[in-house]
Amino acid sequence: MRIDAISIGKNVPQDVNVIIEVPVGGEPIKYEMDKEAGTLVVDRFLYTPMRYPGNYGFIPHTLSDDGDPCDVLIINTRAIIPGAVMSVRPVGVLFMEDEAGGDEKILAVPSSKLTQRYDKVKSYSDLPDITLQQIQHFFEHYKDLEKGKWVKILRWGGPEDAHKLILEGIEREKKKKG
């Protein structure tokens, strides 16, 4: 896969592309895209027997404070194969920190051209409380059994926070490339 050939999206930051790394409900394995090689690699096996509560991936051509592309959790129930590119609409952010520093997770829903199921979801707060609780529980505990690793949930943010993180991530990536 040539990640450099994949666009950020058609209407950034309201509609962005995400490269899927981990499918919803998949085995407790953390995959990451090797950005230089353009191939999916096994990052680690999760020590906790937990499954991702949404399809998980990243926005190409972005760079977060942690040195990786912006992370995205897509709220939907259909497993998307790792390596697929999906158009999404950001609706919020879960602000967290871990042993390495800040680690935000952008929440998104599939774009309307893929499904109209989420058209009324404009913000993370439009999602069912149980969905938000499951997402928070997953990220609070998915590293629990890994020595020296931890996660602290800071707060939820709305779509404007997600848009800001995406735009900052694009600028950070541009500066890195020079």
UniProtKB/Swiss-Prot annotation:
It catalyses: diphosphate + H2O = 2 phosphate + H(+). Mg(2+) 2 binds at residue 71. Its cofactor is Mg(2+). Its main location: cytoplasm. GO terms for biological process: phosphate-containing compound metabolic process. InterPro entries: Pyrophosphatase, Pyrophosphatase_sf. Its EC number is 3.6.1.1. Keywords: Cytoplasm, Hydrolase, Magnesium, Metal-binding. Pfam families: Pyrophosphatase (PF00719). It is found in: Cytoplasm. Substrate binds at residues 30, 44, 56, 142. It comes from the Bacteria. Mg(2+) 1 binds at residues 66, 71, 103. It is an enzyme of class 3 (hydrolase). One of its GO terms (molecular function) is inorganic diphosphate phosphatase activity. Homohexamer. Catalyzes the hydrolysis of inorganic pyrophosphate (PPi) forming two phosphate ions. This is Inorganic pyrophosphatase. It comes from Bradyrhizobium diazoefficiens (strain JCM 10833 / BCRC 13528 / IAM 13628 / NBRC 14792 / USDA 110). The lineage of its organism: Bacteria, Pseudomonadati, Pseudomonadota, Alphaproteobacteria, Hyphomicrobiales. The gene is ppa.
